[in-house]
Structure formats: C-alpha cells, structure tokens
C-alpha cells in the first residue's frame, strides 16, 4: 500500500474491491489491528491503535480472516464462545448471558446444529459461518471481514451478507469487508473502495465506482455491464477481447 488515506464513519457498510494483489487483505488487516501501520497512522475514534488497550479494542473491533485453522480440537460452541473473551476477567468463565449471546449468534448463522462437533471436522464453508458467529457474539461496533463469502455456496453467501446487512441496520454496526463478486458488492454495500496496485482508484457509492471504464482499467479486461433497477450490476467479460 502507498498513498492510502481513508476514513470510515460509524454505521457505514463498506466493500473493498479490486483485483488480486491490489491490497484488499492488507488494508483490512491494518483496520483489524493485525498489521502495524508502519510509518502511517491508524486511528479509532481519534486514538492511535497502538495507544489503546487491546482487550478494550477487541470489544469495539472484530477481525474475521479469510482462512481458519485451529491447532487444538475445540468444539464449534467453544469457538463461538471465544467471542466473549474480551468481556471476561482473568481466570473467569463464561456466564449464562455469554452462553445465551453465543447461542443466538449460532442460531443467526445456522451453525447451532453442529455446535458440539469439532471445529476441524466441519467443512470450509461451515468454518466460515462459525467464525462469523463468534464475531457476532463479540458484539463489536466495527466488523472487519476478509472475503467472508469466499468459501460459501451461493445460498450461504446471500445469508451471510443479509446477516451483516441486518447487523448494520439494526445495531448501526460498521461493516468493512473485502469482496471479489462485484454483483454482490453492488447489491449489499453502500460504499465501495476500488483498489489498484496498492492505491485507492475510486471511492464512493457503488453506482459511481462501478463504471464500465473503471472496471476495464483496473481489471484489465473488456466487459459488458448491465445495471439493474435496484442499482446492482451484472458483468459479462468478453473473453475474446481480453486486453
């Protein structure tokens, strides 16, 4: 990344898009506190990430990575309950309220049916839903997700995006996520940040960012673009005219 400057306001639903290697995962890891900003500054509510208590910051911001692996044989229910750890004192266990919150998060993500199975025994798509359930149980102000629909079939892609939309609308939760599917990005996100070679190429409403010339330049491919009545787009690459 270079020459990046952006801000996210409370309650926004922001999609970060761009081709492979454009910097999507890097910028989300910065926002999630996984990477250091290096010579730059990264602020939450005007305070540098480095100057904030990590446990308190975890109550406000949750990070959902693209890939998940566990060295220990945790059950699905235990993974979701980990979302409550920022609220627990040292050497204390989850209480009834924590268990209820985790149960509700599993219901919302349809993961309750395999709550007692081992996390490493379930499919990649199921793991993604479990990790998102844990993020919901964390009850953050901001949720940062790196391609949360990448391992899901279309049914669960729509389900997860609808869940995030509901959290955004009902709780005013700020959502920032990387996406590859430009159709879904245009349908669910209210703001899109289009990256190209580590820089912000376009930033604005989906109908402003997802212009034919912008997509062709950044993705280096000629396309046919159809804009639906709801503002979402359908893209048909002309494979015979790849630039």
What are these regions (language model features)?
Residues 17-19:
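The feature captures the beta-strand-to-loop junction immediately N-terminal to the Walker
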Residues 32:
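Helix-to-loop junction immediately C-terminal to a conserved catalytic motif
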Residues 40-48, 57:
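Conserved ABC transporter NBD signature motif
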Residues 81, 96-114:
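Conserved ABC ATPase "signature" region
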Residues 92, 118-122, 126:
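Conserved ABC ATPase signature
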Residues 143-147:
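Catalytic Walker B motif of ABC-type/P-loop ATPase nucleotide-binding domains
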Residues 218-243:
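ABC ATPase nucleotide-binding domains
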């Amino acid at each position: 990344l270079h020459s990046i400057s952006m801000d996210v306001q409370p309650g926004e639903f922001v999609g970060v898009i761009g081709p492979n290697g454009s910097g999507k995962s890097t910028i989300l890891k910065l926002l999630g506190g996984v990477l250091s900003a290096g010579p730059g500054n990264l602020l939450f509510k005007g305070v540098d990430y480095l100057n904030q208590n990590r446990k308190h910051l975890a109550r406000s911001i949750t990070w959902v990575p693209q890939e998940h692996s566990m060295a220990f044989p945790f059950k699905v229910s235990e993974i979701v309950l980990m979302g409550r750890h920022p609220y627990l004192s040292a050497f204390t266990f989850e209480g009834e309220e924590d268990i209820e919150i985790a149960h509700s998060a599993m219901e919302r993500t349809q993961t309750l049916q395999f709550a007692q199975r081992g996390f490493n025994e379930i499919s990649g798509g199921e793991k993604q839903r479990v990790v998102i359930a844990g993020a919901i149980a964390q009850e953050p102000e901001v949720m940062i997700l790196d391609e949360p629909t990448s391992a899901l079939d279309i049914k669960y892609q729509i389900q997860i995006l609808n869940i995030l939309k509901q959290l955004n609308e009902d709780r005013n939760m700020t959502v920032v996520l990387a996406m590859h599917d430009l159709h879904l990005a245009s349908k669910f996100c209210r703001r899109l940040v289009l990256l190209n070679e580590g820089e912000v190429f376009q930033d604005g409403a989906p109908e402003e960012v997802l212009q034919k010339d912008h997509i062709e330049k950044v993705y280096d491919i000629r396309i046919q673009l159809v804009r639906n009545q709801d503002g979402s787009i359908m893209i048909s690459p002309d494979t015979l005219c790849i630039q």
